[in-house]
Structures are given as structure tokens and as C-alpha cells.
Amino acid sequence: MKKVIIMSLALLVAGAASVRAADVKENWEKSCSKCHGPDGKGKTKMGEKLRVKDYTEAKVQEELKDDKMTKAIKDGVKDGDKTKMKGFGDALSDDEIKALVKFIRDFKK
């Protein structure tokens, strides 16, 4: 009985912490697609101006590590003293950021 209760609680916590796919897509569209594009290719005015990477390219995906993406989403990206991308650590939870990293990985060809 004790095992059943523990497993039930574990499943409940895991379910509560998960981020729905619709929420991830909404976060991408709201916070990322203006520069990175809806398809992750970066073919937008801002994306081309900032020279963002094409997330559909296997080489880009290979070079870009999860921890680097997580840090960029959380803390932003600077080029010298200029901000290329604002951080979203105050607006997104760690689970939402982790889900965005997975979403970006899914752009790979």
C-alpha cells in the first residue's frame, strides 16, 4: 500500500510539473518567433539583422549544447555591451525553459 501511495504522489508531482506542448508553442510564438521565425530558420527582419542561427541545420544543432541554450534563454545574449537577446528567466520557469530547448531541438532536419 505504501508503494502505491508513493507512486501515485510521484506521478501527480510529475504531471503537475510538466509543460504542455501547446504552452511551449505559445511561448515560442510570443517570445522567440519574432527573431527566430515560426520555423526556427531565423529568416525574419530581426533575425537577419541579428544574424540568428538556423535551428533546422544539423550542424547548428550539433554545435549548440543544451546548457548553452538554457543559459541564453534564461539570461539573454550579449555581444559586447549590446543585448542581442533579452533573458526570459524572470518570465519562464525552469521547466518552461527546458521545454523550449526541446522544442528548438525538434526543428532539426
Give, region by region, the residue ranges found by the protein language model:
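Short microdomains enriched in Cys/His and/or Lys/Arg
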Residues: 19, 54-64
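Cleaved targeting-peptide boundary
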Residues: 21-29
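Sec/Tat signal peptide C-region and signal peptidase I cleavage site
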Residues: 15-21
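Soluble non-cytosolic domains of exported or imported proteins
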Residues: 22, 63, 67, 91-95
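Positively charged n-region of N-terminal signal peptides that target proteins for export
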Residues: 1-4
